[in-house]
Every structure is written in C-alpha cells, then in structure tokens.
Amino acid sequence: MFQAAILRKKKKIEIHNFNFPQKLRCDQVLIKIKYAGICGSQIMEYLGKRGKDFYLPHCFGHEAVGKVFAIGKRVTKVKIGDKVILSWIKGKGLDFGGFTLKNTKKEKINFGPISALSSHVIACENRVFLKPDKMNYLEAVLYGCAVPTGAGIVLNQLKKIRENTKVCLIGVGGVGNAALLALLKKKCQIYIVENNNYKLKFLKKFNLKILKNNFELRKHSNFFDICVETSGSAKMIEKSLDLIHPSGMVVFASHPPKGDYIKINPHHLIQGKKIFGSWGGCCHLDKDIQKIFKFFDYKNTFIKNSKIKKYSLNKISLAIEEVLKGKVNRAIIKF
C-alpha cells in the first residue's frame, strides 16, 4: 500500500491510500520515493490559477528522487534498484500517458505520466533519469525541476555571459535560486529584484545589489544586458523589457496565472530588444543532469545555498503556505 497527495478541489488536498496495481503498464516504472519537491506549478494548481482543472481529483507533483521498485516489460532505460530522478521534462523512453487508480475507498483517482507527491510513484519511462552517484538525494530532487529550469537558462540559453555582463534576476524562489547560483559561478554582475523580507534576509549572504522598489527599477531602465524573470508576474515580465538596453535580452521561466497576459511596447522590439520563454531551461535531462552537476564541480551546491525545508506528506498544505509567504525557496516532502 502507498499514500499520495490528492488535489480534490481548489485549496483542498487529501491524503489517500492506494494498493499497488497487480501489473504495471509496459511503459511504466514504479519508484519508491525518498523526497518530492513542491514547485510553482503545484501551487498554481492548488490556488486554481491554471484555469479549469479537468482531471480532478488527481495526484500531482513533478519532481522527485527515489529507487526503482519495479518496471514494465518494455522499459529498458532503468532497472530495479537504480537510484533515479523524476521530472516533468520529457526525456528518452516510452510514454503512453496518464492513468487512473482506485483508492482503498474504491474511488477513481487520476494520475499523470508523473505524479510525484506520493510515497511510491508510477511514472512513464521518459520521466525517469539515473541519479549521479556523488549526488546527494536531497540535492537530486531539485534536479527534477528547479535546477534544470533555473541553471539551464544560464547554461543553455545565455551562453555568452561574461564577467562584465550585467544581469538582472527577478524573483528568488526555487527556479530563481538555481539561476542565481549558476550566475554566481559565471562571475557576472548580478542585480536582484526582490521585496519579500524572508528572501531579502536569505540573500544577504551573497552580498548582491538589490533593487527593492519602482524608483530603483526606473533608475536602471535600459541598463542591463540580460534580465532573467522567475517571479510569475505578468507585470514583471513587462518591466523586464524596460530594464534591458536596446540589444538586451529577457528570458522568463515564470508562469503567470491563466488570463494574465503581457503587453509589449512594439518599439522595444524595433529597437532590438529580445524576449524569450524557457521550457525547462531547454534541458535534455538524459545528458544535462550530468552536465549541470559537472558545471557545479560535482558538488551538492543547492542544498548548501538554498532555503530548503522538509515536511511530512500530511503537512503538505503548510508547506505550500510557507512557500507562498517566501519562508522557503523549496519545500520538500520527505517519505
């Protein structure tokens, strides 16, 4: 038997018990989970800001780490006993989509190709990746979403960063913190836009220039070479274009609520300003997990330089609330 967090409706999470299926689908991998992370996507679902949810009630979550417990008959990527990272980012392997499973009360519950907030996860083969041997389990869970998205932007989309490059980073949540640590290793000129008091206290250790209000932002109009936007605010994505100079670039990995749109001054684009979205930091995790780990000198960098807090599964609503308040960069469910 295993337990999973089930989103019943907006702002209502329940913990359900499930019996293991008698047989896995041919593309599926069963993983006993050590840690699972809560990121902005789950919080958006919880708050009902992704629009109408057609799959309620459903398990959710999309980054985790654990050990392979069983595999479907056509799975070749991993074997029983392998230590693996789970991610929403698709890699090599089979993927025949989501499925339903009855809980112990005989109610049908929806599961996706990966639904990670569960003591045991049944995932499609293409969402499962081998964990590097030297990588700590707690570090590894962040490689399911936060690290490839944040650090991936820096390594895959901003390859020309130099020491004299002026970079503005907006928002220091899980993805923003990963981008920050990658930028610090690039030794460029970093400015942070943040006004959450918990996060400002955390940022003191890095001794960076902080832009806290609109006055300071206006002073830096047309100033930056690059702006990385991770706050999830449509208004801040718009503001990013004001901050870069005419040949500058904005990359945003944030996901504003459904119905929030950005308005762009056409003259910004005529000037030569560029704006790009980022899908998982343009990462291919079958190779980029190792690539990013190597970039950080095979060290467990993120658990040493992030505000991470562990919670039990039955404290998941508290974990979400503390992320929303900015008390932690990443909330981790420990199983």
Regions found by a protein language model. Give the residues of each.
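A short acidic, Gly/Pro-enriched loop at the edge of an enzyme's catalytic core
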Residues: 218-227
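NAD(P)H dinucleotide-binding glycine-rich loop of Rossmann-like/cofactor-binding domains
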Residues: 90-170
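Glycine-rich beta-strand-centered segment in the early N-terminal region that forms part
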Residues: 19-36, 49-93, 132-135
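Mid-domain Rossmann-like dinucleotide-binding core that forms the NAD(H)/NADP(H) cofactor-binding site
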Residues: 133-215
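C-terminal hydrophobic helical "lid"/dimerization subdomain
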Residues: 2-4, 238, 286-335
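Glycine-rich phosphate-binding loop and adjacent beta-alpha segment
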Residues: 235-300, 335
